[in-house]
């Protein structure tokens, strides 16, 4: 089985390209919060989706799409890549797929397709997970070092000027005795 190789497309020749829906992987990532860019509920989302998975799911829904690998996600600078999906019929506001009326339903359908394509989601690489043995050694119970005992003595001195404009009272001087 040979996989189709992506080809370069001149988007200036595609009519209405600017009106295509833009989908980032964060929009359907169930591991993220709404503040980080998730647009569907956690139940409908997918754990760490990739651009090729989203493109394959979109193609199965009968919607043409283009992967733009050079584009970045505005909320995360280092997340590169997005999809542009031709949602509407040419020159109209009618959706290509009558079962998908808007973008939210589109995102849910894409996530459902990805769950069917790859039900066992791989865990993302987390370099911090490799530090677990080191943390276990460093978090052993340490006996506290004996601290010197200090005694604080407060002495008072009478006020030097009786006609001061500040609040009255005795000045306190703290002295530490070891």
Curated annotation (Swiss-Prot):
Q: Any keyword Ribonucleoprotein?
A: yes
Q: Where is the composition biased (Basic residues)?
A: 168-178
A single cellular component GO annotation: nucleolus
Bias (Low complexity): 148-167
* Intracellular or extracellular location(s): Cytoplasm; Nucleus, Nucleolus
Name its GO BP terms in alphabetical order.
Answer: SRP-dependent cotranslational protein targeting to membrane; SRP-dependent cotranslational protein targeting to membrane, signal sequence recognition
Family matches, as Gene3D superfamilies: Signal recognition particle, SRP19-like subunit
Q: Where the protein is mainly located, per its record?
A: cytoplasm
Is the keyword rRNA processing in the record?
Answer: no
Disordered: annotated span: 135-178
Tell me what this protein is called: Signal recognition particle 19 kDa protein homolog
Origin organism is: Dictyostelium discoideum
Recorded name of the encoding gene: srp19
